[in-house]
């Protein structure tokens, strides 16, 4: 897979720019603030239909304008595909493949996979559990359309369940039973996929961490879930009184987490800044490797200012790993 060309119009700080890329490595060099990261985010948009950095498309529109347009030319197995993404304020985002609009954005996810490594990834360790769930989702969704559909259906039912809890009424419990039955099979799909991913990710991650850090500390990833083989509908029923008190669904697959440990301690508190940085780079390289294995071809790997706080030896090792 190869991104041959990209065009940006009114995207972030760019009024208009077109870039041609060569196969292999492409490097952007320039002062801070000139827009290097924005080009990477445009590639992320064309791959996953959304920004890496924020959930609002409006934030990607150039100041003073009311729309942006992205175009890209991807090559895979000797076939060229032209991608088109446009967003205008107060309107729906449009995404096209070879001139034909997708009925659903999710239909595009996984066609041209991508892995982004950015300083913002520090939130994987220091942030809340939603950051780590997003990490899981962005991996599995790029090779498993069944998971992506299950995740979307689960979230839709969850939003409706939470609305019923907030609004109350005499039929609340019967309505909750309906949504519980809708959520349970989707939760099972999500749980199994995340569990399998974590097990497959562990050896890749440990190997990359050892090579990058050059140290012998033990690192681990552990998947923590409310499901764990128990009856999901029964769990939801048993938590209803707490749900009513808190005014939202307090238990479920949407509360899952990844636990990152170093020498048996939580990496959030026990790891130094350098160790956390090595942890994140190893995670993302493991993600890159796993998606490559699942899809049979390598995704685009976007590296955004990742060498800060690394010594010369670690920088050389990361470059070697990426090059291999």
Which residues fall in each region the model found?
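Helix-to-loop junction immediately C-terminal to a conserved catalytic motif
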Residues: 44
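Conserved NTPase motor "head" modules and their coupling/switch loops across ABC/AAA+ ATPases, GTPases
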Residues: 1-31, 171-185, 189-302, 309-324
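Intracellular alpha-helical coupling/juxtamembrane segments of multi-pass membrane proteins
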Residues: 60-63, 154, 194
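Conserved lysine of the Walker
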Residues: 36
């Amino acid at each position: 897979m190869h991104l041959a060309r990209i065009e940006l119009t009114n995207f972030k700080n760019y009024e208009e720019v077109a870039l041609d890329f060569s196969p292999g490595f492409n490097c952007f060099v320039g002062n801070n603030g000139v827009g290097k990261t924005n080009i990477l985010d445009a590639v992320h948009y064309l791959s996953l239909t959304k920004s890496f950095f924020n959930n609002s498309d409006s934030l990607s529109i150039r100041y003073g304008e009311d729309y942006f347009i992205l175009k890209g030319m991807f090559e895979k197995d000797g076939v060229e595909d032209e991608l088109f993404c446009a967003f205008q304020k107060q309107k729906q985002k449009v995404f096209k493949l070879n001139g034909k609009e997708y009925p659903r954005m999710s239909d595009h996810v996984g066609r041209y996979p991508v892995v982004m490594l950015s300083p913002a990834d520090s939130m994987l360790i220091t942030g809340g559990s939603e950051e780590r769930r997003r990490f899981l989702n962005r991996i599995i969704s790029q090779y498993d359309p069944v998971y992506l559909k299950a995740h979307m259906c689960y979230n839709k039912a969850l939003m409706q369940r939470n609305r019923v809890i907030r609004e109350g009424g005499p039929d609340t419990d019967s309505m909750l039973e309906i949504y519980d039955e809708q959520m349970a099979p989707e939760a099972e799909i999500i749980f199994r996929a995340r569990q399998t991913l974590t097990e497959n990710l562990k050896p890749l991650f440990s190997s990359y961490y050892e090579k990058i850090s050059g140290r012998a500390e033990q690192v681990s990833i552990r998947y923590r879930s409310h499901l764990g083989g128990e009856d999901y509908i029964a769990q939801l029923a048993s938590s209803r009184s707490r749900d009513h008190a808190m005014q939202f669904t307090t238990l479920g697959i949407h509360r899952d987490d990844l636990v990152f440990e170093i020498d048996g301690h939580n990496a959030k508190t026990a790891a130094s800044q350098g160790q956390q940085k090595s942890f994140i780079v190893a995670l993302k390289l493991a993600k890159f490797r796993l998606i490559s294995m699942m899809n049979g071809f390598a995704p685009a790997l976007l590296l955004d200012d990742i060498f800060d706080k690394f010594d010369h030896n670690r920088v050389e090792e990361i470059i070697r790993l990426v090059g291999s």
